[in-house]
Swiss-Prot record:
<dbReference type="GO" id="GO:0009380">
    <property type="term" value="C:excinuclease repair complex"/>
</dbReference>
<dbReference type="InterPro" id="IPR038476">
    <property type="entry name" value="UvrC_RNase_H_dom_sf"/>
</dbReference>
<comment type="similarity">
    <text>Belongs to the UvrC family.</text>
</comment>
<dbReference type="Pfam" id="PF08459">
    <property type="entry name" value="UvrC_RNaseH_dom"/>
</dbReference>
<dbReference type="InterPro" id="IPR000305">
    <property type="entry name" value="GIY-YIG_endonuc"/>
</dbReference>
<dbReference type="InterPro" id="IPR010994">
    <property type="entry name" value="RuvA_2-like"/>
</dbReference>
<comment type="subunit">
    <text>Interacts with UvrB in an incision complex.</text>
</comment>
<dbReference type="InterPro" id="IPR004791">
    <property type="entry name" value="UvrC"/>
</dbReference>
<dbReference type="GO" id="GO:0009432">
    <property type="term" value="P:SOS response"/>
</dbReference>
<keyword id="KW-0742">SOS response</keyword>
<dbReference type="InterPro" id="IPR001162">
    <property type="entry name" value="UvrC_RNase_H_dom"/>
</dbReference>
<dbReference type="GO" id="GO:0009381">
    <property type="term" value="F:excinuclease ABC activity"/>
</dbReference>
<dbReference type="InterPro" id="IPR036876">
    <property type="entry name" value="UVR_dom_sf"/>
</dbReference>
<dbReference type="GO" id="GO:0005737">
    <property type="term" value="C:cytoplasm"/>
</dbReference>
<dbReference type="InterPro" id="IPR047296">
    <property type="entry name" value="GIY-YIG_UvrC_Cho"/>
</dbReference>
<feature type="domain" description="GIY-YIG">
    <location>
        <begin position="12"/>
        <end position="89"/>
    </location>
</feature>
<dbReference type="InterPro" id="IPR001943">
    <property type="entry name" value="UVR_dom"/>
</dbReference>
């Protein structure tokens, strides 16, 4: 079915539309009160340059019907999180204040401090502009609710609990001293506390305490009683602090050309406690209302705290739908307001002035960085007699540990700056044993073969190639590139420690001055690819270390393996289990249980099948 026919068949119904390019990649996700009117509008009449560029890449589209606009907005946000489409507005953190993070996606969630809010399923609370207030909050939380703070992911079973468990600050799920349901109750209580739902929390704690007492679980009831008293004390203090003000976020943004910056002031108890800002990508050509709507959806879908009132410098598109969505996320009413007078208008003007100032400062810094990078590239071109300015530079490195799990990495700089989205990593497939030269040749042959095959991830060829190593690695690289018919690309090797630069055709190294901007950019590129390779290699080692004999048993996938380890605690304990013990594990059947026994050298009748006495 061609696009015209699909457009003609669009329903007049709320939903989400998904635009695909010729490669099938998702390039834009949007929501609409009427899919028919909204999607057809892209292919009718004139649009802003960015929208026209997006439409020119649309080869196909699909849509999902929803009951109403709020449901469409929720689905739109989830799909944007999942696919990160090229033409949707996105926020890029420059810096942020610390948040409290609760890893709710884990079986036994942890509480942590973090400065980055990512889409990992965790809940985030904050930001905290005062280190003192953050420490006080954490101290209070750890005293009230004993949930774990360790870094184990996944949770590693232990025979004995840690010190925190002995002093009553952890329920010790690692030692099997608490079940998931009880632990989740504690986590839910923490979330209610951080959300400020103190009345609901007091009620919940009372009910849990009374239920524990009715079951004659007096130790648990006493712990809940102490938590209840502490929460009630905190509530009384906060009532006094909150009596003079209210909680709100104040949001504005500034734009200049393609650059845009969003700024949020956090007002708690009637006082501005801090701010956070984000750079907006993909906002050019959009109206101010569209940008504000995108900013709200992107920021609050991250799992951050949502106050009861959000003050806005510009009226967002679909304000009523966004307010309903935010209210659903918060679990209470959220008001979106564009003040016209009074102190709240003054606050928003201040936020906007700050946004303009921050954007100007950012643009000035970026211009200076671009000028510095260009000067370094010009110096590099002159010193090395390069045929053209090395705008795209690629570096390659090989990493291995005692000859095992060799990996390769490619880092990319464009105009002297890192371009992480273009970084690539390679698992070495054809080389056995430690052989950096052969591994490097495999990586380069795969990279340039992909370019010849028009793979969009490798389509852009470099103006300059840097190899982490000396003459040996350099010759291996050039040999491969010539065999691939790549053509002339200036290729150099940068040796560590003495920082000598090698080129093909001479054994005499080039020694650049230590203060040289050209050397500094090469060092940065070399160090970046080395870091990327080491990180990938470490991840592979950790993944290999977590493997066990269970991974080789048919029918035991990640989910079943997790259930087995949760039930028994370790592979050693599983090896002592009987068929009946295994069948007690959630999701287990007799066939797989028998395979596990066989894989562990046991028979289903309980006898050892190894033939040992």
């Amino acid at each position: 079915m061609d696009l015209e026919e699909k457009l003609a068949r669009l329903p007049d119904h709320p939903g989400v539309y998904i635009m695909h390019d010729a490669n099938g990649a998702i390039i834009y996700v949007g929501k609409a009160a009427s899919l028919r009117n909204r999607v057809r509008s892209y292919f009718r009449g004139q649009h802003q340059p960015r929208t026209q560029a997006m439409v020119s890449h649309v080869a196909d589209f699909e849509y999902i019907l929803t009951d109403n606009e709020v449901e469409a907005l929720i689905l739109e946000c989830n799909l944007i999180k999942q696919h990160r489409p090229r033409y949707n507005v996105s926020l890029k953190d420059d810096k942020s204040y610390p948040y409290i993070k609760i890893t709710t996606q884990e079986d036994f969630p942890r509480i942590q401090i973090t400065r980055s809010v990512t889409r990992d399923g965790s809940r985030y609370f904050g930001p905290y502009t005062s280190a003192g207030s953050l420490k006080e909050t954490l101290k209070l939380l750890r005293g009230l609710f004993p949930i774990r703070t360790c870094r184990d992911t996944p949770l590693q079973p232990r025979s004995r609990p840690c010190l925190n468990a002995h002093i009553g600050r952890c329920l010790a799920p690692c030692a099997g001293q608490v079940d998931r349901e009880t632990y989740r109750e504690a986590v839910d209580n923490v979330i209610m506390f951080l959300e400020g739902r103190h009345t609901a929390l007091v009620k919940e704690l009372k009910e849990q305490m009374e239920a524990a007492a009715a079951r004659l679980e007096f130790e648990k009831a006493a712990r809940l009683r102490d938590q209840l008293r502490a929460v009630q004390e905190v509530c009384e203090k906060q009532k006094l602090a909150a009596a003079s003000g209210e909680d709100a976020d104040a949001i504005a943004f500034a734009r200049e050309g393609e650059a845009a910056l969003g700024l949020i002031f956090f007002s708690r108890g009637g006082k501005v406690i801090g701010r956070d800002h984000f750079f907006l990508t993909g906002s050019e050509g959009l109206s101010r209302g569209e940008v504000m709507a995108a900013l709200l959806k992107e920021y609050y879908s991250r799992g951050v705290e949502i106050p009861p009132e959000i003050l806005l410098h510009d009226e967002p598109e679909d304000a009523a739908t966004i307010a309903s969505w935010l209210s659903r996320l918060r679990g209470g009413r959220v008001n979106l307001r564009v003040p016209k007078r009074g102190t709240k208008l003054k606050l928003l003007r201040l936020v906007h002035e700050n946004a303009v100032s921050l954007l100007q400062e950012h643009l000035l810094t970026r211009r200076r960085q671009e000028e510095g990078s260009r000067a370094a590239l010009l110096e590099l071109q002159e010193i090395l007699e390069l045929p053209r300015l090395p705008r795209r530079m690629e570096a390659y490195d090989i990493s291995n540990f005692q000859g095992s799990s060799q990996v390769g990495a490619m880092a990319v700089f464009v105009d002297g700056r890192p371009l992480p989205s273009a970084y690539r990593r390679f698992q070495i497939k054809t080389v056995r044993g430690p052989n950096d030269f052969a591994s490097l040749q495999e990586v380069l042959s795969r990279r340039f073969r992909r370019a010849a095959e028009q793979d969009p991830h490798f389509a852009d060829l470099p103006d300059f190639v840097l190899i982490d190593g000396g003459l040996g690695q350099l010759h291996a690289a050039r040999e491969t590139m010539e065999a691939m018919g790549v053509g002339y690309i200036p290729t150099f090797g940068l040796a560590k420690e003495e920082e000598l630069l090698f080129r093909v055709g001479t054994s005499e190294p080039i020694r650049l001055p230590r203060e040289s901007k050209a050397l500094q950019i090469l060092q940065h590129l070399r160090d970046e690819v080395h870091r990327f390779a080491i990180t990938y290699h470490r991840q592979k080692r950790e993944k290999t270390a977590y493997r066990s004999v269970l991974d080789d048993i048919p029918g035991v996938g990640p989910k079943r393996k997790k259930a087995l380890l949760r039930h028994f605690g370790s592979v050693a304990a599983i090896s002592k289990a009987t068929l009946e013990d295994l069948l007690a594990v959630e999701g287990m059947n007799r066939t797989v249980a028998a395979r596990i026994l066989a894989g562990l050298g046991r028979r289903s009748d309980g006898e050892d099948s190894t033939g040992s006495p």
